[in-house]
Regions:
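Charged, low-complexity, helix/coiled-coil-prone segments
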Residues: 1-7, 33, 51
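A short, surface-exposed loop/turn module that caps and links secondary-structure elements
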Residues: 30-54
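Enriched for short, Lys/Arg-rich terminal
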Residues: 2-18, 22-25, 40, 56, ...
């Protein structure tokens, strides 16, 4: 099986650490799943961007997949109310 390398940007790490422990655990589990299949689960392309979002309950993981480099860059982790605001 081919795996992807997950790279979490500083902003996403900060956002993750600010969340309740149970939500952190769910998101970390989702990130682990993304290593083997980045588009599994509730994933949709974000309109007007090359990024995708994965839904984890009320939270969203915003990420970019580089198929050539086999990397997933985690850009943001936020509550759905804030996820789509720029």
């Amino acid at each position: 099986m081919s795996y992807f390398r997950v790279i979490i940007h500083r902003k996403a790490v900060k956002e993750l650490k600010s969340l309740p422990k149970d939500i952190q655990a769910r998101i970390l589990e989702a990130l682990k799943e993304m290593e083997s299949s980045p588009f599994a689960g509730d994933v949709q392309k974000i309109k007007g961007e090359e990024a995708y979002r994965r839904r984890i309950g009320d939270y969203r993981i915003e990420f970019i997949v580089d198929l050539e480099e086999r990397t997933i860059a985690i850009l943001r982790i936020s509550h759905r109310r804030k996820a789509y605001k720029k």
